[in-house]
Amino acid sequence: QQHSHYLYIDLKTTSTVSPHLFGHNLEHTRASIMDGLSAQMIRNRKFAGAAARNGVALDWEGIGECVYFANEHRLPGSNANEAYVCHYAHNGMWRRNECQSQMIQNPIPNQVSGIRQKELFLQKDRSYPFAVVVKVQQPLDVRVALTNADGTQIYAETVFPVQPVLAKEDAQEEVDEWQRFETILTPGVDDAHAVISITYTEQAQLLIGAVSMMPDNHFHTMRRDTVEKLKEIGVRLLRWPGGNFAGEYRWQDMFLHPDRRAPMEGYMENETQPFTHGYDMHEIDTDDFIALCREIGAEPFLTINAAWDSPEVCAAWVEYCNGPAESKYGRLRAQRGHQEPYNVKWWSLGNEMGYGHMEGANTPDGYASLVETHARAMLKVTPDLKFVSSGPYPNQEWVDVSIKKLAPIAPYVSLHTYNSVHWDFTSPEGMERCYNEMIRMPIHN
């Protein structure tokens, strides 16, 4: 039996569909960045997190039978040289094991000592720019090699002769003893289980501050294939850097070299623990994000760190994005090669404030008072910004207090709803019920 269905279109009633109807949230969480959008191939390349019992950083293995390994630390607010990575400014936020380096001490002459990392995916038609940052106390040769899984086949290698950096007796300032060495590794093979090793044989100490390796076709440190997929699906509004990660993000760290930017530990470690041990290596900065938006045709939508960044710091971010090249932060943007303002209009006043997983003001009135101060400081830089408030919705108290109080300054609201589905993949009927629940979700949001 056939059934006929008719669709009637009322041409007298029209409405405008926003070009931003289809948007995405690009958050530094789970595998979204590392092994996702980022082209960086080295995992835990800045040695963050608690080391293993043998002193070797997570995702790395030690080389040598009788070698001492340890993680060297930089204490919060310290300028001491214990680690290479650091934050641009101390904003009061403190996280564990962000600023560290890998120490290697070889007590036996001619013993091969160092570290290695497995499971690198190599392509024969690609070259790989490689860099390592080291500090030594005496001359030694640092050998870098790309090999197969058991080390019997060397695909590419190079040796960096390293001399210690010595301070002059009359030096007035502290000397940076860290040195960065670069090369291009061209393995010429396809291997999904390759190994990178960094070794030396002298009876000496080697400190490694950061390691970097990316394919030569990356787009602003991002994977070209992933960028093309984002372009293909037609994202028109892209929110960044979160999400929950907005509460960890320090936008001013972009003024440091990418290798020197300290990793950022997530307050909600459980989200990224299985993927990056709870740390983000800060591979993507504001300039990279804007370049991505322009490449895929999306409007940029930035989220401030309302809990830890002051109104002045958030206003400075607006000036970096939108200020003329003659302004303080616009000048910094121009010096980085971007003379014209980015004209970022959409800004989120924090993320999901009111939920327990976000730090800062978690009451409707407290949140509204906090972000209103931030918003007014930002509007002094760019008066026509479009602010979006956040909160735990549906929640009538937040509607009555927060939304109404912020309405004159933030007319848009971001509703983050979490829906539960009865997962049942044990039978065709269960799968059909699960599917139907999923497709009905928009009706309730």
Give the role of each language-model region.
Residues 1-282, 299-301, 309, 315, ...:
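Extracellular and organelle-lumenal recognition/adhesion modules and their flexible linkers in secreted
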